[in-house]
């Protein structure tokens, strides 16, 4: 799915509003995913998945950092996320459906924290962006 210039502007503006809360929102999205889709917990057997866990916060920060990198490279997501794609496809072997579940959880988290900025257009742009990120992360599964 190609991001239009308007989509790119919406994604950059929305992520800019996330600002210093990116790691916090990443952790919240992970917690939301674990609660809403319990099967996703199977990829984290060594984590303390309780609310406020340092491990969930740490992984949330990694998710946020990857998304921040992606936002900075909207015209070259495959290049920006190549190493992460390799990791998830070849080492971690994460089922691709889980990226959609995390994307949904991220959208809900962003909507809850940015209600005045989460317009239908921004929602659509972020959804397209996260779908593109998911596509890139699963591109090396073949």
Curated annotation (Swiss-Prot):
Metal-binding found in the keyword field: yes
GO BP term (any one): hydrogen peroxide catabolic process
Keywords of this entry: Acetylation, Heme, Iron, Metal-binding, Oxygen transport, Phosphoprotein, Transport
Modified residues (Phosphotyrosine): 25
A Pfam family: Globin
One Gene Ontology cellular component annotation held by this UniProt entry: blood microparticle
Assigned protein family: Belongs to the globin family.
Assembly: Heterotetramer of two alpha chains and two beta chains.
Protein name: Hemoglobin subunit alpha-I/II
Organism, scientific name: Bison bonasus (European bison)
Phylogenetic classification of the source organism: Eukaryota, Metazoa, Chordata, Craniata, Vertebrata
């Amino acid at each position: 799915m190609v991001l239009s210039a308007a989509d790119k502007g919406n994604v950059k503006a929305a992520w800019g509003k996330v600002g210093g809360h990116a790691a916090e929102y990443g952790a919240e999205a992970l917690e939301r995913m674990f609660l809403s889709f319990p099967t996703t917990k199977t990829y984290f057997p060594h984590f303390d998945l309780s609310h406020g866990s340092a491990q969930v916060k740490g992984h949330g920060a990694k998710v946020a950092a990857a998304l921040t990198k992606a936002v900075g490279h909207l015209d070259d997501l495959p290049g920006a996320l190549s190493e992460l794609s390799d990791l998830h496809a070849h080492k971690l072997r994460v089922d691709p459906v889980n990226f959609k579940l995390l994307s949904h959880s991220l959208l809900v988290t962003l909507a809850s924290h940015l209600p005045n900025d989460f317009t239908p257009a921004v929602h659509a742009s972020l959804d397209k962006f996260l779908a593109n990120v998911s596509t890139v992360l699963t591109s090396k599964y073949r």
